[in-house]
Curated annotation (Swiss-Prot):
<keyword id="KW-0479">Metal-binding</keyword>
<protein>
    <recommendedName>
        <fullName>Exonuclease</fullName>
        <ecNumber>3.1.11.3</ecNumber>
    </recommendedName>
</protein>
<keyword id="KW-0540">Nuclease</keyword>
<comment type="function">
    <text>Facilitates phage DNA recombination through the double-strand break repair (DSBR) and single-strand annealing pathways. Also important for the late, rolling-circle mode of lambda DNA replication.</text>
</comment>
<feature type="binding site">
    <location>
        <position position="119"/>
    </location>
    <ligand>
        <name>Mg(2+)</name>
    </ligand>
</feature>
<dbReference type="InterPro" id="IPR011604">
    <property type="entry name" value="PDDEXK-like_dom_sf"/>
</dbReference>
<feature type="binding site">
    <location>
        <position position="129"/>
    </location>
    <ligand>
        <name>Mg(2+)</name>
    </ligand>
</feature>
<comment type="subunit">
    <text>Trimer of three subunits that form a toroid, with a tapered channel passing through the middle.</text>
</comment>
<dbReference type="InterPro" id="IPR051703">
    <property type="entry name" value="NF-kappa-B_Signaling_Reg"/>
</dbReference>
<keyword id="KW-0269">Exonuclease</keyword>
<dbReference type="InterPro" id="IPR019080">
    <property type="entry name" value="YqaJ_viral_recombinase"/>
</dbReference>
<dbReference type="GO" id="GO:0051908">
    <property type="term" value="F:double-stranded DNA 5'-3' DNA exonuclease activity"/>
</dbReference>
<dbReference type="GO" id="GO:0046872">
    <property type="term" value="F:metal ion binding"/>
</dbReference>
<dbReference type="InterPro" id="IPR011335">
    <property type="entry name" value="Restrct_endonuc-II-like"/>
</dbReference>
<keyword id="KW-0378">Hydrolase</keyword>
<dbReference type="Pfam" id="PF09588">
    <property type="entry name" value="YqaJ"/>
</dbReference>
<keyword id="KW-0460">Magnesium</keyword>
Amino acid sequence: MTPDIILQRTGIDVRAVEQGDDAWHKLRLGVITASEVHNVIAKPRSGKKWPDMKMSYFHTLLAEVCTGVAPEVNAKALAWGKQYENDARTLFEFTSGVNVTESPIIYRDESMRTACSPDGLCSDGNGLELKCPFTSRDFMKFRLGGFEAIKSAYMAQVQYSMWVTRKNAWYFANYDPRMKREGLHYVVIERDEKYMASFDEIVPEFIEKMDEALAEIGFVFGEQWR
């Protein structure tokens, strides 16, 4: 997936985009992204009816295609994370010994239906997801709990990022600037084929349902960028 194709389809030069800016939000419109994929793979408690969180995300993506507008998110926790992300990345590079290249958005293929926004692509071939927890309690939970303490939504995010990029491993790091020392902790998450099989099955079904719903109201995917 080349920058030229993205430019041709969206009018946006991805090489000039930074995570979090207006162009970045526009590139994600109607696209199933890593941070939200836990909604797509959410399973019903019984029967086949989609859970509320899956249905809600479905309607959100449809609205983004039809309006070309993303819902506003102004959470304090997001602002906190953004504020310390560069410090976290620098400390991670120093601690791990790998070089990190920023990458605003990566699409799985030319359909542009699925994408992830890594916090970095590492010189050893792995990806990087950085979290700067809003509370030190959450940092402590991960610091002591490791893999077991990673939220299911975050695990889905990392596994989906590997599905999109076809990488085999991903660093998952937490940074807390309030810690007097030992403020960075990370683990390496390996590609899990169970997740891959789940994405292979559920994501195309979800996209098909999106296209059916869009057709019903007279829209097609891609109109969000016109």
